[in-house]
Amino acid sequence: MSVLPSHLKYADSHEWVYLDEEGHAVVGITDFAQESLGDLMDVHLPEVGADIDQGEEIMSLESVKAASDIFSPLSGEVVAVNTELEDEPERVNDEPYDGGWLFKLAPHDLSEMDDLLSDVDYQGLIDQS
């Protein structure tokens, strides 16, 4: 297990998020989540322009072990997706906090960031798993 990046906020459903320089919320899954899933075979990305609520299912990942729904840590409009994952889903396994990002949102309510976990709190959650 890698050290959790401290600049990210975490959902208890194992997604991470941070705000980029344009104010968009960049979303991915944690190293814990990708390890639990195993080798990814397919990524079903959301549609750009989709409007999503915090905690709502937005996409899915298929691995050699199972299919898993991904939930949005914030409400907002999808403004970008990582299309490189369509040909290289293994990037989520290899670079969960970097090149394996999933999608970007234009967030509707930044106060929702307060609902998310710090790296320390998320580590406590996964230590109980």
UniProtKB/Swiss-Prot annotation:
The modification N6-lipoyllysine is found at K65. Its cofactor is (R)-lipoate. InterPro entries: 2-oxoA_DH_lipoyl-BS (IPR003016), Biotin_lipoyl (IPR000089), GCV_H (IPR002930), GCV_H/Fam206 (IPR033753), GCV_H_sub (IPR017453), Single_hybrid_motif (IPR011053). Signal peptide: none annotated. Disulfide bonds: none annotated. Binds 1 lipoyl cofactor covalently. Pfam families: GCV_H. HAMAP family: GcvH (MF_00272). The glycine cleavage system is composed of four proteins: P, T, L and H. This is Glycine cleavage system H protein. The gene is gcvH.
